[in-house]
Amino acid sequence: LEAAHDQRLLDKENEYVVLYQLLMRAEAPFKAAKVIDYGIKEEFVEENEKHLKYLAQAWHLSQELDKAEPVYKKAAEKAKDGELYVFLGQIYLATDRLNLASESLKKGLEKGKLKDPVSVNILLGQVAYEQQKFDEATTFFRKSLDKVSDIKGKNEEDTFKKQDKLRNQALKWLTYTENERERVRILNLRRKDLEENA
């Protein structure tokens, strides 16, 4: 199939999708992205949510974040759930665009039907922490803790492990954030004292 694609012999959506899946299984996401991208551009493959998601994920796994970002955006707008906004938010976070990360992650929560809303709240808390919005960060970490019991696994043991891991993660971030908020408060008081006594 790959040779047929190289010679531009593929002309059916199914052929492009199968080749994409084979390349992804072979851990060749860059090639997979090129294949599905060509298929979409040449209109052999329908530009729908599913195929855009394939393309975005392949670019993402290829570390081609600049190419993944606009495709995630387009796919997220078409999606029925918020998962693709979460992926987009992770790209923004990885590239230090914190306002966009926060906006995208919040859109993901609003759209709903997320596999793991607890992790999204933790991510939002981390973004707020990085912006030194400690009260907002604390709110997100507390929301995470409130929703941990909603997370389900394959079985009881898996559920316990997932919940425990997320609970510990949220608690560590919450403690860290509260300590940092206090440290910054004390530094600001000292700075104010120094300015008044100068």
Where do the PLM segments sit?
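Alpha-solenoid helical repeat scaffolds
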Residues: 1-131, 136, 142-194
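Short, solvent-exposed mixed-charge patches
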Residues: 196-198
